[in-house]
Amino acid sequence: PRSTLFPYTTLFRSLARMEQLRDEAAHGGKQAVLCGDFNIAHTPLDIKNAKANETHAGFLPEERAYVDKWLGELEFVDVMRDLAGNIQGPYTWWSQRGRAFDNNVGWRIDYQFATPELAETACGFVIDKAPTYDLRWSDHAPLSIMYDI
C-alpha cells in the first residue's frame, strides 16, 4: 500500500534535507533533537501485535526502513529506546477502537531522535499516559525526555 497524498519517496527525500541540517548543526558545534509523531512503529518491540500488523500502514517494511535510515545513515539515536532497553513498549498511541487503551494494546510511534552527543546526556524519560481512557485528552501520550545539559 502506498499513499497517493504523501508517497514514501517524499519521506526518503526528506532525509537528504535532515542530513544537511544535521551537518550544519555539527559544523556549528551544536546538537539536535527531532521529536514528534512519526506514525511508524519501528520494531516489534514498538507495537503490541507486530505479526498481525505487518501489512498495515504504520508497520510496513518500507516505513520501518525509513526509520532505519534515521538511526543508521543519519546516525541519530532513538533516545527513549536507548534509555528503556529492549523491552516491549512502552507505547505512545492507542487505537480508539475496542479497549486498546485499557488493555495497553498500543504502538510506540512518537519519538525523540537525537544526535549521539546529545543522546548521551539523556537521563530519563516519561510517557504521560492518562490513568484511564476517560481522562485522556488525545489518542497519544506525550513523550518527555530529560537531558542533563
Summary of predicted features, one role per range:
Residues 25-34, 77-78:
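Short, structured loop/turn "capping" segments at alpha-beta junctions
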Residues 14, 18, 34, 63-66:
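Amphipathic alpha-helical interface surfaces
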Residues 12-29:
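A long, amphipathic alpha-helix that forms part
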Residues 1-10:
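Single conserved hydrophobic/aromatic residue that forms the stacking wall/gate
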Residues 44-149:
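Metal-dependent phosphoester-hydrolase catalytic domains
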Residues 30-44:
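Acidic/histidine-rich, metal-coordinating catalytic segments
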Residues 7, 28, 138-139:
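Residue-level preference for short coil/turn positions at secondary-structure junctions
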Residues 1, 36-37, 106, 110:
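Glycine-centered flexibility sites
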